[in-house]
Curated annotation (Swiss-Prot):
Biased composition (Basic residues): 1-10, 448-463
EC number: 3.6.4.13
PANTHER family: ATP-DEPENDENT RNA HELICASE, ATP-DEPENDENT RNA HELICASE RHLE-RELATED
Quaternary state and interactors: Interacts with the SSU processome.
Cell compartment(s), UniProt: Nucleus
Region (Disordered): 1-43, 442-474
Entry keyword annotation includes rRNA processing: yes
Protein name according to UniProt: ATP-dependent rRNA helicase RRP3
Biased amino acid composition, Polar residues: 24-36
GO molecular-function terms, A-Z: ATP binding; ATP hydrolysis activity; RNA binding; RNA helicase activity
Motif (Q motif): 48-76
Protein species of origin: Coccidioides immitis (strain RS)
Class of this enzyme: hydrolase
Domain Helicase C-terminal: 278-422
Length: 474
């Protein structure tokens, strides 16, 4: 493909608006299904390149520079339909390439008719919003696309200034976007051409439904809308009926609880009191690999990170009680491999752009099968192999049986010699004592704020402020 010079496109804005130019990815057979209502059913096709899908040369070059050698299934099936001007429902797991599936058609349309406030992407969490924006900017680098990220936890005035610069793409969490729609003078989305709701099931799980309704009421009806979700719940069905026009459904998974064939999953049946020892044994069995360890609480995440560092492991915590800059810093260190172990609550289970994870360890089992699928989906991505281990104690048997039932199979137990494991007990015990001491100091130093590390969770009856809804608690 011939090399491209960096382009700048401009447009003539509507009367009263400032002139605005471009200034500064499952292994099963993909299927297209008919959605309930008036939407159509069409046959899946096979393509070999982004150009075959109808993507223009400059965007194909951007894909090539990012290492996108061939379209993933969700991209191959959804992009041609999007280019035809259809509304879409995309059912795809994390790691299927769905961000590029909606970003490429939007960028191509933007190049054809450039304008400010062209596209809006709604995401459930702050981290995912930043990642989507980064991917838009990377794919649109040759045309200098300009994005604004509008999420909670950041300064409203700075965001209002960014919106005043007339970005082409806005990536936002719903609560903070509605704040700006209600309070930022001169900001509106009346000229919007594209709306994307990413991780729609997660948006609704976080109770963004009423906020989404308010946002939808102020958007122009003449627009293209894409809804992407890992599952098609009744809530998601209601949302698509309210927001999409005659959509096509694109699905790349026939099984709600399907995992990829390149993922090897095992469990370890162990006594609860020895969980830390078995965890260290497993990490020693797979030295140097990139690992995500999932825990259930903020407190356990912090404790395990301290324990692992005391034993010489490059571990870093990620949870919802860290500041926004600390969370982004933790992700950056893990992506760059300056730390190879990420100890995380389920804030990292969905959507985060962590490309090469070799191993997922469920230190604590999730409470439901869907979360298990999202956790282990962090490995064995894009055709690569991966492993997932789950520590199952005497208190977890019922939950584990439910997970296996949802998967439709019993997972093999990973056999270890107990004597070999218990050799580590003295060293682990010393590290545990160190972690207890450091955690105590951490709580004392934070004073009242230390409560944020004491397993704080939002109960079903409790309400979070709109600004906090895009911040993961656990």
């Amino acid at each position: 493909m011939p090399s491209m010079k960096r382009r700048k496109l401009s447009h003539t804005p509507p009367q009263g608006e400032a002139e605005d130019g471009f200034s500064d990815s499952e292994t099963s057979q993909a299927s297209l299904q008919e959605t309930p209502g008036n939407d159509e059913k069409i046959e899946a096709t096979t393509t070999k390149s982004f150009k075959d899908l109808g993507i223009i040369d400059s965007l194909c070059e951007a894909c090539d520079s990012l290492g996108y050698k061939a379209p993933t299934q969700i991209q191959a099936e959804s992009i041609p339909l999007a280019l035809q001007g259809r509304d879409l429902i995309g059912l795809a797991e994390t790691g299927s390439g769905k961000t590029a599936a909606f970003a490429l058609p939007i960028l191509q349309a933007l190049m054809d008719k450039p304008q400010s406030m062209f596209g809006l992407v709604l995401a459930p969490t702050r981290e995912l919003a930043y990642q989507i924006s980064q991917q838009f900017e990377a794919l649109g680098s040759l045309i200098s696309v300009r994005c604004a990220v509008i999420v909670g936890g950041m300064d409203m005035v700075s965001q209002a200034i960014a919106l005043g610069k007339k970005p082409h793409i806005i990536v936002a969490t719903p609560g903070r976007l509605l704040d700006h729609l209600e309070n930022t003078k001169g900001f509106s989305l009346r000229s919007l051409k594209y709306l994307v709701m990413d991780e729609a099931d997660r948006l609704l799980d976080l109770d963004f439904g009423p906020i989404l309704d308010k946002i939808l009421k102020v958007l122009p009806k003449e627009r293209r809308t894409y809804l992407f979700s890992a599952t098609m719940s009744s809530k998601v069905e209601s949302l698509q009926r309210a927001s999409l026009s005659n959509p096509l459904r694109v699905s790349v998974s026939s099984n709600k609880y399907q995992t990829v064939s390149t993922l090897l999953q095992n469990c370890l049946i162990i006594p609860h009191k020895h969980k830390d020892i078995y965890l260290i044994y497993l990490l020693n069995e797979f030295p140097g690999q990139s690992v995500i360890i999932f825990t259930r609480t903020v407190n356990e995440t912090q404790r395990l990170a301290i324990l692992l560092r005391a034993l010489g492991f490059g571990a870093i915590p990620l949870h919802g009680q860290l500041s926004q800059s600390a969370r982004l810093g933790a992700l950056g260190k893990f992506r760059s491999r300056s730390r190879n172990i990420l100890v995380a609550t389920d804030v990292a289970a969905r959507g985060l752009d962590i490309p090469s994870v070799d191993l997922v360890l469920n230190y604590d089992l999730p409470s439901d099968s869907k979360t298990y699928i999202h956790r282990v989906g962090r490995t064995a991505r894009a055709g690569k192999s991966g492993r997932a281990f789950s520590l199952v104690t005497q208190y977890d048997v019922e939950i584990w049986q439910r997970i296996e039932a949802a998967l439709g199979k019993e997972l093999d137990e990973y056999k270890v010699e107990k004597e070999e494991v218990m050799v580590l007990s003295d060293r682990v015990g010393e590290a545990q004592r160190h972690a207890i001491t450091e955690m105590k100091e951490l709580h004392e130093n934070r004073g009242k704020k230390g409560a944020t590390l004491r397993n704080r969770r939002i109960g079903k009856g409790a309400k979070r402020s709109r600004d906090e809804m895009d911040r993961e608690e656990g």
